[in-house]
UniProtKB/Swiss-Prot annotation:
This is Tubulin alpha-1C chain. A motif (MREC motif) lies at residues 1-4. GTP binds at Q11, E71, S140, G144, T145, T179, N206, N228. The modification Phosphotyrosine is found at Y432. Tubulin is the major constituent of microtubules, a cylinder consisting of laterally associated linear protofilaments composed of alpha- and beta-tubulin heterodimers. Microtubules grow by the addition of GTP-tubulin dimers to the microtubule end, where a stabilizing cap forms. Below the cap, tubulin dimers are in GDP-bound state, owing to GTPase activity of alpha-tubulin. The modification N6-acetyllysine is found at K40. Some glutamate residues at the C-terminus are polyglutamylated, resulting in polyglutamate chains on the gamma-carboxyl group. Polyglutamylation plays a key role in microtubule severing by spastin (SPAST). SPAST preferentially recognizes and acts on microtubules decorated with short polyglutamate tails: severing activity by SPAST increases as the number of glutamates per tubulin rises from one to eight, but decreases beyond this glutamylation threshold. Glutamylation is also involved in cilia motility. The lineage of its organism: Eukaryota, Metazoa, Chordata, Craniata, Vertebrata. Mg(2+) binds at E71. Its EC number is 3.6.5.-.
Amino acid sequence: MRECISIHVGQAGVQIGNACWELYCLEHGIQPDGQMPSDKTIGGGDDSFNTFFSETGAGKHVPRAVFVDLEPTVIDEVRTGTYRQLFHPEQLITGKEDAANNYARGHYTIGKEIIDLVLDRIRKLADQCTGLQGFLVFHSFGGGTGSGFTSLLMERLSVDYGKKSKLEFSIYPAPQVSTAVVEPYNSILTTHTTLEHSDCAFMVDNEAIYDICRRNLDIERPTYTNLNRLISQIVSSITASLRFDGALNVDLTEFQTNLVPYPRIHFPLATYAPVISAEKAYHEQLTVAEITNACFEPANQMVKCDPRHGKYMACCLLYRGDVVPKDVNAAIATIKTKRTIQFVDWCPTGFKVGINYQPPTVVPGGDLAKVQRAVCMLSNTTAVAEAWARLDHKFDLMYAKRAFVHWYVGEGMEEGEFSEAREDMAALEKDYEEVGADSADGEDEGEEY
């Protein structure tokens, strides 16, 4: 069996975790107490969901997941919520004082008190797996726990499970809707520390999700629940191939093989369609061609950047539901003719396609309409560098005045780490620039890789 362990870190990670596991349970017919009624199982006979759930002797299905936060309030909601019986109490790990939006607290002072306990729990989960293929780590860039503790955890996972894949789902700080002043510091410190430990990181920009909720679902003031439910649909689409019998991206390494041309260039852009409210869906056909086309609209992306200004290095289309290859080929052919899609010149214009016949599930009473088919596009494009440039700029504005730096130094960090992290980010921006440059100019630059 090819199991995946999900690790949800900090408030953002935990709340997205709630939305994701709620959706997984609905998709696999698992009740909030972990039981799977026998009438549900006979039909499929597909046990691929065991990659995400382990079954106990009593027939209860337990998520292969760990929830970690340095303060208890958010995880206490899981402990008392609808799905409290789903998780093993040991899978919900809380500290006593939070990281106070401070990377240094999450990574050094508070984080190191709890890291061994967390690794011990992860080890227990890993021991239940017959063929662990890797970890999915959910966290935000901006929070103290999400940034600091995640980077500490990733370093330790690399030591303990060197060969296993580590995929991240990272919440990128929204330009308009900021929850902390020091988000740029935390983001850049965590990106620098995790860059060499993460194999593939899907970024989700809160603001992009806000806009999608406002525009496509007519929610005037989206709440985090609205955002998380939308994010969970995307996560579910990306992981559907791991949880149902599929043909493409059946394991985590395949994602990397398909999307990551160089180790550092591992930030694919995710786009999901159709995001549509029930009232509208009733009057629309949403054909394969339409939803495929929607994926190339910057408005449907999870990160605000414009791929029309960048070049594509790789592109995966993951369909689910009532989709036949003939329609997909036609849709892609149309897009190739009329879209201004530029691939880098060293990469053939290949679209990799996966089809999963399990139709998308929606949370009852949620915002999304139940549709027959959906698509998630994962593309590695040089346009993502725009997102880094925005963050780096904000970092520079604050760091030029050394604003707030004393809070980090006071927790045992050295100021040199800031400039080191910033230099690494500058190098990352440069890497993106070079990858997009035409290969004819870059003959002498091959030594770096």
